[in-house]
Design a protein with these regions (language model features):
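Acidic catalytic/metal-coordinating carboxylates
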Residues: 36-39, 62-65
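Residue-level signal for the "D+5" position in two-component response regulator receiver
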Residues: 33, 58-61
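Conserved phosphotransfer cores of two-component systems
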Residues: 45-47, 69-76, 97
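C-terminal output helix
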Residues: 89, 107-117
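Two-component/phosphorelay signaling modules centered on CheY-like receiver
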Residues: 14-32
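Active-site beta3 strand of CheY-like receiver
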Residues: 47-53, 58
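Alpha4 helix (beta4-alpha4-beta5 surface) of REC/receiver domains from two-component response regulators
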Residues: 65, 86-102
Length: 119
């Protein structure tokens, strides 16, 4: 009997990237998508994922604040942080917060898949 697909919540405001995730990971994961931090928190409660992929820059909040809320609501959930920020400040901002991966955009989707699978 096949194992059930892992549930992955992608919190990403870029429509093109959400479409890329949906197409690339179809059949590999059960996916849910949120374009804002508030949508992400609602889905986190309504459909708890096995893994969260979190963009650091969202229209209604920043990723650090959202990561703190996620940790408070769902301690232990594996979080993979993604960002287009190339400076060191975003990396320093999440130090001390639990996450299992940090990817700079653009990144290879196979790399993201490997991190999701390992989480």
């Amino acid at each position: 009997m096949a194992e059930p697909l892992r549930r992955v919540l992608f919190v990403e405001d870029e429509p093109a990237l959400r479409i890329s995730y949906e197409r690339y990971f179809a059949g590999r994961y059960r996916m849910a998508f949120a374009a804002t931090g508030s949508e992400g928190l609602a889905l986190l409660e309504a459909q708890p994922p096995d893994v969260l992929v979190l963009d650091m820059r969202l229209p209604d909040t920043d990723g650090v604040a959202l990561l703190r809320q996620v940790v408070a609501r769902r301690p232990g959930i594996p979080v993979i942080v993604t960002t287009a920020y190339t400076s060191i400040e975003p990396q320093l901002a999440v130090l001390g917060l639990p996450y299992v991966g940090y990817l700079l955009k653009p990144f290879d989707l196979d790399d993201l898949a490997a991190r999701i699978d390992a989480a």
